[in-house]
């Protein structure tokens, strides 16, 4: 085992194992998927990306959530986050869904490009939540802050099968999730 670990890490080992003719050393390498790959494959619910670039799969989030596409991350997002943080007294975390009701799914390179805007500045949580109902389930008890354009879409019946009743039911479920 020690020789296999040394070999796998690129270190030469002088350890004599006294292997007999019937013994053999097998080395097996297994790669670990990146957190973004796990999310895209549906094997993770969230990926929290910290300002220093560290990523954590399904790390609990207790913050104010500001969803957006962040293409680009601009002064309006920053000001909305500052206002929300001062009102709620909580840290604001930006949420970027890698899938969207209105757009094709984001590719890994595009996700990384959008995340690069936040390095050293803010925490981002990546999700696959296309709707606010799904977002509320992922972050129970977390307040959400949204801009005007998102508020208009939130109450548009077309996102609820063109049904005002479905929209009101979904909003009630979001409210119930806290």
PLM regions and their residue ranges:
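Nucleotidyltransferase catalytic core that binds NTPs
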Residues: 1-178
């Amino acid at each position: 085992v020690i020789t296999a670990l040394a070999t796998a890490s690129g270190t030469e080992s002088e350890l004599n194992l006294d292997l007999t003719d019937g013994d053999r050393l097998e080395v097996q390498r297994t790669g670990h998927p990146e957190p973004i790959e796990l999310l895209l494959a549906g094997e993770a619910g969230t990926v929290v990306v910290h300002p220093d670039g560290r990523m954590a799969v399904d790390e609990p989030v207790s913050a104010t959530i500001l969803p957006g596409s962040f293409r680009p991350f601009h002064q309006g997002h920053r000001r909305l986050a500052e206002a929300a943080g001062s009102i709620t007294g909580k840290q604001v975390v930006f949420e970027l869904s890698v899938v969207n009701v209105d757009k094709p799914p984001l590719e890994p390179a595009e996700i990384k490009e959008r995340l690069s805007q936040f390095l050293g500045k803010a925490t981002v949580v990546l999700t696959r939540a296309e709707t606010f109902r799904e977002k509320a389930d992922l972050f129970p008890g977390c307040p959400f802050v949204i801009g005007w354009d998102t508020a208009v879409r939130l109450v548009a019946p077309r996102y609820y099968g063109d049904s005002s009743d479905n929209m009101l039911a979904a909003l009630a479920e979001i409210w119930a999730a806290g």
